[in-house]
Design a protein with these regions (language model features):
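Acidic (Asp/Glu)-rich catalytic clusters
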Residues: 30-32, 66-73, 109-125, 180
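Short histidine
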Residues: 104, 112, 215
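Aromatic- and acidic-residue-enriched segments that line the glycan-binding/catalytic groove
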Residues: 86-104
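Short beta-alpha junction loops
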Residues: 81-84
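Histidine-centered catalytic micro-motifs
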Residues: 2-6, 123-132
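Surface-exposed, active-site-proximal loop segments in enzymatic domains
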Residues: 47-50, 90-95, 134
Length: 254
């Protein structure tokens, strides 16, 4: 399971992988013998399978779809329903300095764009309602974030919302139990370690500085044992480890 965020040749942020690099990475993974699989198949698949995920549903992800279609690689885009309502910019504390500098890069998919993903054979999952730090929420707010986001996505897209991706990759036993009772089939985290719980499916975080060789290493058995993408992300954004500020949704300028 690979975890991406944005696809951009111009946004020089760790989250944004250039399109040509993304295609090189996909070809490198297939060359290593990984078999493309759906999100559901990864829950029980044995051997080398690959599924691509995109957290936050950035609009730039649309650039990657033709590459995935050509190579036959399934993907899931994880969206926050409050963003799909349109007119808002993705604004979290870690990215706040860039909101004014690169608002277009932080634009997210609206409902019609998410429906287009479904029509093209891709899957849309939940990234919670407002992208909070789930482990810091009370039980009632935690349930609301998980259950209401699933219900709103199902209402807006007309298909079942089967999977969840934890914001920031953060989860614990209480969060996993809440996800299980909120109607999901499985949930995806970010640690590189292997896990038997389908509500803590590990993913490998891919960043702008990861060329095809590094992705090859990260997806190797040794690389998966050694890597910890959450620690890597927190190293890039030190405030992530200690800040618990709420997400602020800003109206995008026309």
């Amino acid at each position: 399971m690979l975890c991406y965020h944005a696809i951009s040749d111009t946004w020089e942020d760790a989250l944004a992988v250039p399109l040509y690099v993304f295609e090189e990475q996909m070809r490198a993974v297939l060359k290593r013998g990984y078999r493309p699989a759906t999100a559901a198949e990864t829950l029980s698949a044995r051997g080398k399978v690959v599924h691509v995920t995109f957290d936050d549903a950035f609009r730039s992800v649309a650039q990657a779809l033709p590459v995935l279609e050509r190579l036959g690689i399934p993907a899931t885009v994880f969206a926050c329903p409050v963003l799909a309502d349109g007119g808002k910019t993705f604004d979290v504390p870690e990215l706040r300095p860039q909101v004014e500098e690169a608002p277009d890069e932080l634009a997210t998919m609206a409902w019609d764009e998410l429906r287009s993903l479904i029509d093209r054979g891709f899957e849309v999952g939940s990234h919670t309602l407002t992208h909070p730090h789930l482990t810091s929420l009370g039980d009632d707010e935690l349930r609301r974030e998980l259950q209401e986001s699933r219900e709103r996505l199902e209402d807006g897209l007309g298909v079942a919302c089967r999977f969840l991706a934890y914001p920031y990759g953060e989860e614990d036993e209480r969060v996993r139990a809440a996800a299980r009772s909120s109607g999901y089939r499985g949930a995806f985290a970010l640690p590189g370690r292997q896990a038997a719980d389908v509500f803590a499916v590990p993913r490998v975080g891919i960043w702008r500085t990861d060329g095809s060789r590094r992705v090859t290493l990260k997806t190797s058995t040794l690389g998966r044992r050694l890597s910890d993408p959450v620690a890597s992300m927190r190293a890039r954004w030190p405030r992530l480890a200690r800040r618990r500020e709420p997400v602020v949704w800003r109206e995008r300028k026309a």
